[in-house]
A protein has these predicted regions:
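Transmembrane-helix signature of polytopic, membrane-embedded enzymes
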Residues: 28, 120-140
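Alpha-helical transmembrane segments and terminal signal-anchor/GPI-anchor hydrophobic tails
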Residues: 58-68, 91, 195-225
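Loop-to-helix entry region of an early transmembrane alpha helix in multi-pass inner-membrane enzymes
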Residues: 88, 100-117
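Membrane-embedded helix bundles of polyisoprenyl
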Residues: 132-160, 187
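Transmembrane-embedded, aromatic-rich helix segments that form part
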Residues: 174-177, 187-198
Length: 225
């Protein structure tokens, strides 16, 4: 709880500073407040305590499993379920980092660095602080959830960056990020097909039959994923 309060407080301070700069008409290329938020949140996420206390997992429900997978991924399948069900790109990414180091903090730094960067990039690109500082302040909650669902939040990060690429008409980058998100976690396919609808239906009318069909397809894809 103390960790979360510290993160929220630092987030509030940095957000207030950035919004004050925006209101004063200052648009700095290097946003110091974002940098402070990035590195503090990254440090707290990477070096948080992960373990068991009285049979209860501390530091995120999935965190011990991911650490175990990272440390044993080069040794063979073993008994770790992630060797069986994890998507190929996540396995490749994990093994690539493990080849360089056995320190899981480095692994976490890369993962949470991507997640935090995607949040800040998305908010900055769409000027979400222009009228309200609440969106960035509220990011502490999904970020904390990433402690328990690492792969899910990696895919969310890639999708957010893909939306930024879409806004800037960098379509090749957008598709690359969306495809990567599916090969990190297949359930993200339901979100990755968003640009197809965007490109097609910005010039075509959406009917009730089509909307119903897409909902059914989306539910099926989500269930399969």
């Amino acid at each position: 709880v103390i960790l979360y309060l510290v993160m929220a407080s630092i987030g509030y301070f940095c957000i207030s500073e950035e919004r004050r700069s925006i209101q004063n008409g200052v648009r700095r290329r290097l946003k110091v407040s974002y940098a402070i938020l990035f590195f503090v949140w990254l440090f707290l996420a990477v070096y948080r305590y992960v373990g068991y206390e009285s049979g209860i997992i501390i530091g995120g429900n999935d965190a011990p499993t991911y650490i175990d997978y990272f440390q044993t991924c080069l040794a063979g399948k073993g008994n770790n379920i992630y060797f069986v069900r994890t998507e190929p790109l996540f396995q490749i990414m994990t093994k690539a980092v493990r080849t360089i180091t056995s320190n899981y903090h480095v692994y976490f730094a890369l993962i949470y660095g991507l997640i935090i960067f995607s949040y800040l990039r998305f908010i900055d690109e769409f000027d979400l602080l222009q009228s309200n500082k609440t969106p960035l302040f509220m990011l502490v909650f999904p970020f904390i959830q990433s402690f328990c669902a690492i792969r899910t939040h990696i895919t969310i990060a890639l999708i957010l960056l893909a939306i930024v690429a879409l806004k800037n008409r960098r379509n090749i980058l957008m598709w690359g990020l969306l495809i990567a998100s599916v090969f990190i976690q297949r359930a993200s396919l339901i979100y990755a097909i968003f640009p197809i609808f965007y490109f097609y239906y910005k010039k075509n009318k959406m009917t009730m039959k089509k909307a119903t069909a897409f909902i059914i397809i989306g539910c099926a894809v989500g269930y399969i994923g």
